[in-house]
Curated annotation (Swiss-Prot):
Keyword field: Aminoacyl-tRNA synthetase, ATP-binding, Cytoplasm, Ligase, Nucleotide-binding, Protein biosynthesis
Chemical reaction(s) catalysed: tRNA(Arg) + L-arginine + ATP = L-arginyl-tRNA(Arg) + AMP + diphosphate
Key word Nucleotide-binding present: yes
GO molecular function, one term: arginine-tRNA ligase activity
NCBIfam families named among the record's database cross-references: argS
Gene3D superfamilies membership: Arginyl tRNA synthetase N-terminal domain, HUPs, Isoleucyl-tRNA Synthetase, Domain 1
Species whose genome carries this gene: Ruegeria sp. (strain TM1040) (Silicibacter sp.)
GO BP: arginyl-tRNA aminoacylation
Protein name stated in the entry: Arginine--tRNA ligase
Protein family membership: Belongs to the class-I aminoacyl-tRNA synthetase family.
Motif 'HIGH' region per UniProt: ranges: 131-141
Main location: cytoplasm
Amino acid sequence: MNLFTDIRTLVIDSLAAMTAEGALPEGLDFANVTVEPPRDAAHGDMATNAAMVLAKPAKMKPRDIAEALAAKLAQDKRITSAEVAGPGFLNLRLDLSVWQDVLGKALNAEEAYGRSDMGQGKRVNVEYVSANPTGPLHVGHTRGAVFGDALASLLDFAGYDVTREYYINDGGAQVDVLARSAYLRYLEAHGQSVEFPDGTYPGEYLKDVGAALKDKFGDRFVGQPEETWLEEVRNFATDMMMDLIREDLALLGVEMDVFYSEKSLYGTGRIEAALESLDAKGLIYEGVLEPPKGKKPDDWEPRIQTLFKSTEHGDDVDRPVKKSDGAWTYFAPDIAYHYDKVSRGFDMLIDIFGADHGGYVKRMKAAVSALSDGKVPLDVKLCQLVKLFKDGQEFKMSKRAGTFVTLRDVVDAVGADVTRFMLLTRKNDQGFDFDLDKALEQSKDNPVFYVQYANARIHSTLRKAREAGIACDEATLSGADLSLLTHDAQLAVARKVAEWPRQVEIAARTNEPHRIAFFLYELASDLHGLYHLGKSEESLRFVNESSELATHANLALARAVSIVISAGLGILGVKPAQEM
């Protein structure tokens, strides 16, 4: 269904024929031959680099290869012209029937149009959000949640078997801090005046936890030493925070398949098993690391520690996994967690971290490479910071959270759909200034409005056509005479529809769902342009009062656009608007 793949296959077959005829030497590798849209649409519909990449290994001039390939391609009825440009690029123009055929396939496939078998059912684990269970999700978590969820949906659309996973960081010191903070709110619920020391969590959201602790335990823990209440309060508060986090995720339409507890790794032999696996490969040793330059990391000490030879798998330095006092480092449970992922049989792992975890990437990749003997790739995506603006001012704090803007604040301000789309209009590793006022503007400068308005405009046109007695059911539109679509503006839209399967595969191959948002904006722009041309040219109007056949063809084109927009928005986790 990917037209660009079809034409690339034609190019490869033509090169193979040239080889058989002696026009090219034997043994050439065609893997780097591409077929893509040209940078300038005036140059044609597609362009191939075949002559440029084959010239050196073939020991031939690129133009000679390009001219011979052009003659071969011109024999195919789908190619109306093949022109050599510059040093040896080949620009192709396709017969109009090709674009019309693509529209027919889109109409018949409906929202399955663009789905790919690229993933071949390979199992992918996408871990995202994984926020500490110490409070509500903030705007940084929101970006990670949106990015991870859209990426998971994209990979599913591209034929992968995807598991969405959240790692609960409930095994470290931060949940002890949560417990102590919740205990203070518990005392407050009993009427005591409390002060929050530095390092505790002062947010008002813990008042609910304090009240719930009072309801469950009464005054049992009042005035008692920490060792009598820490574990129970910690477990209770962590569970309540995870309930809050699940509610926050639900506001964005994010549903996880797996919630994996860090705590489950301790005392179960899982950390030991992971390190034994590395030890069996000669990758664990006792030693003292050289002191690092600059700021010393938390896990460095000038004594003998248990170390992982991560440098043998691409890391800059070897990493401690057990301290000199026998305690695990932060890295040890992370190794065990990824060992568990590898053991579950995933073919590919994707971790989505905040930008502040950039220094963790190499060691994590080294661990997965070592644990899987290089068979399971790990891709780590970093999400840069988001700054919120409202009324021209940076929006910095939530009263309930105390120190940060929450996910709930953002969704309350602009809605889940707008939040999701807007956060996907920038690549994940770029900082993003999110203007809440502009996100609600009804203008071309607001991408989510512009795309949604295109879809709503199409549905409005179809409704009005039905009300006027014009048949525009799926069967009628699928059977429309698409050969009537010959205007440049119509063909520009058709070409964009044809590019959709290619965009899906590129976005999935690079793990970049923002490409989908960009593409939808471009498609919407072409649709709006065609609509406005119809105001002055009757033949381009979606409803052409002079020709029922032209009306059906135009409505079929519009319907194909709606199919792509709906599928694309579905990948982004945004509900397509049918009216605005």
